[in-house]
Amino acid sequence: MSKKLLIKTWGCQMNEYDSSKMADLLNAANGYELTEEPEEADVLLLNTCSIREKAQEKVFHQLGRWKTLKDKKPGVVIGVGGCVATQEGDHIRQRAPYVDVIFGPQTLHRLPEMIKQSQSDEAPVMDISFPEIEKFDRLPEPRAEGATAFVSIMEGCSKYCTYCVVPYTRGEEVSRPMDDVLFEIAQLADQGVREVNLLGQNVNAYRGPMHDGEICSFAELLRLVASIDGIDRIRFTTSHPLEFTDDIIAVYEDTPELVSFLHLPVQSGSDRVLTMMKRPHTGIEYKSIIRKLRKARPDIQISSDFIVGFPGETDKDFQDTMKLIKDVDFDMSFSFIFSPRPGTPAADYPCDLSEQVKKERLYELQQTVNTQAMRYSRQMLDTEQRVLVEGPSKKNLMELRARTENNRVVNFEGSADLIGQFVDVKITDVFANSLRGELVRTEKDMDLRSVISPTQMMAKTRREDELGVATFTP
C-alpha cells in the first residue's frame, strides 16, 4: 500500500509551483501519492505565505488542527515550508515542537532526506538556508497536469521594497541556466503542455547563464521558449516596471505565442508613496511602458497590484492612484489594504489612517477596476475567441472550461476529447467572473500545424547562384 502525502498551499503561484515539485520529488524518491484527506496522510506539509496580515497565526491555527491528528497517529510527519518557515523557523520550533520538518523555499529539494532524518533523530529537522539555485538540480523530471504548466525561471528579489518580505524569505535574485529552463519546458511540451507560465518574483530580471559563459536575457528567453514545438502560448508572472525594457516590449511585436495580457504591478499612482515604498519608478514612467506596449500590441490588456492605505497616504495620493487606474484602464487588479510585515522598514512607519478610510478607499478602487473589467468583457460579446480548453467546467461537469488570451474563463458545451486543445468559441454571455461561449471550430479545422517533409523543406529554402550552385538555408 502506497504512502500518502497531503500538501496544503497558501500564497502565490511560486508556492503552487513549489508544492507541485514537492509532490513530484516525494513520489519519485519514496512513492508518496497525494491525498486530500488529512486522516489518510503519512506526511502533512504546509507550504506557507507571509505576504498577508496574520500569516503566522494562520499557520499555528492549521498546525493545531494537525496536532490532533498526530496525537491519534504518532507516526505522521508534519512539515512546514515556504516563507513563514524561513521567517519564523525558530519560533515554530518553540511554539509547535510537534512539527518534524521545517524547510524554506530554497531547500525543498532536501525533503526526502529531512523526512527520513526526522523519523530517526530528535525532531524537528530544520533547513531554511538559501543555497542559490541548487534545488532545481535535485528535482525529478516534471510531470504535466493538463495543458498548462508553471515553470520557475528565477528565484528571489533584490529590490527591497519597504513593505515586502520576499528578499528576506526567498533570498536575492538568482536565475536558472537557460538550458535547464528550455529542457524543462520541452519535457512538458512532450507531455502535451500547450501553455507555459514563466514564474519569478521579478521574472523580467532574468539573466540566465548559458553554456558558453554568455548571459541570456529575458527577451531572448521568451523567443527561445516560443520556438519550442508544441508551445503555443506563453505567459509570465510577476514582472517589475524597472526592468520592463524595450527589448522585452519588442517581443510583443514579433512573437504571437506571447499572450496579449500582462500583469505589471505598480502598487500606487502617487510618486510620493512610490518613493516611500522604494519603488524605483514614477507614475509617468509606468504609463510610458504601457504606451510602448500598446503600440507594439494594440489589443494588450493590463492587470496590476495595488496597496491601499500605505503609511502616510493622503487623499491626494489615493486620487493619484485612481487617476492612474483610469488612465491606464486596467482590466484586472489584485488590491489589498497595507499590512505591516515584521522585519520590513515600512512596519515601523507611523500611520494615522483609520481602518474605515482604508476600507472605503479599497472599495472605491476595486469597484472602478471591476467596472473597467466588465466593459472589456462586454466588448467580447458576439466575438470569436481562440481559447485553450483546460478541463471540465467547475460549475457544470457536463461542460468544458477554457481560457482566453486575456485570462478570462469561458464555459461552453463540448466533448471531453477537446481538453488540451485550442478551439474557437463565440462569446454569447458575460458574467462577473466568467464568459459563456458556443463552439465554432476545433483545432483540426484551424491549420495550427503544417507538416513539411525534408524534401519540401529543402526545396523551400533552395537558392541557386548565377553559376547554378545550390545552397540551402536552415
UniProtKB/Swiss-Prot annotation:
Q: Under the cellular component aspect of Gene Ontology, which terms does the record hold?
A: cytosol
> What Pfam families does UniProt report for this protein, alphabetically?
Radical_SAM (PF04055), TRAM (PF01938), UPF0004 (PF00919)
Tell me the protein family, please: Belongs to the methylthiotransferase family. MiaB subfamily.
Where does the MTTase N-terminal domain start and stop, copy by copy? 3-120
Q: What EC number(s) has UniProt assigned to this enzyme?
A: 2.8.4.3
CDD domains for the chain: Radical_SAM
**PANTHER family documented for this protein:** CDK5 REGULATORY SUBUNIT-ASSOCIATED PROTEIN 1, MITOCHONDRIAL TRNA METHYLTHIOTRANSFERASE CDK5RAP1
Q: Which UniProt keywords apply?
A: 4Fe-4S, Cytoplasm, Iron, Iron-sulfur, Metal-binding, S-adenosyl-L-methionine, Transferase, tRNA processing
What is the top EC class of this enzyme, as a single word? transferase
Q: Which residues form the TRAM domain?
A: 378-441
Q: What is this protein called?
A: tRNA-2-methylthio-N(6)-dimethylallyladenosine synthase
Under catalytic activity, the entry for this protein gives: N(6)-dimethylallyladenosine(37) in tRNA + (sulfur carrier)-SH + AH2 + 2 S-adenosyl-L-methionine = 2-methylsulfanyl-N(6)-dimethylallyladenosine(37) in tRNA + (sulfur carrier)-H + 5'-deoxyadenosine + L-methionine + A + S-adenosyl-L-homocysteine + 2 H(+)
Query: InterPro entries in the record, alphabetically?
Result: Elp3/MiaA/NifB-like_rSAM, Methylthiotransferase, Methylthiotransferase_CS, Methylthiotransferase_N, Methylthiotransferase_N_sf, MiaB_methiolase, rSAM, rSAM_horseshoe
Say what the protein does.
Catalyzes the methylthiolation of N6-(dimethylallyl)adenosine (i(6)A), leading to the formation of 2-methylthio-N6-(dimethylallyl)adenosine (ms(2)i(6)A) at position 37 in tRNAs that read codons beginning with uridine.
The protein's required cofactor(s) are namely:
[4Fe-4S] cluster
Q: Mostly located where?
A: cytoplasm
Give the note describing cofactor binding and stoichiometry. Binds 2 [4Fe-4S] clusters. One cluster is coordinated with 3 cysteines and an exchangeable S-adenosyl-L-methionine.
Subunit info here reads: Monomer.
In the record, which residues are listed under signal peptide? none
Q: Where does [4Fe-4S] cluster 2 bind?
A: 157, 161, 164
Give the residues the record marks as binding [4Fe-4S] cluster 1.
12, 49, 83
Please give one Gene Ontology molecular function term for this protein.
metal ion binding
Enumerate the spans annotated as Radical SAM core domain.
143-375
Instruction: State its location(s).
Output: Cytoplasm
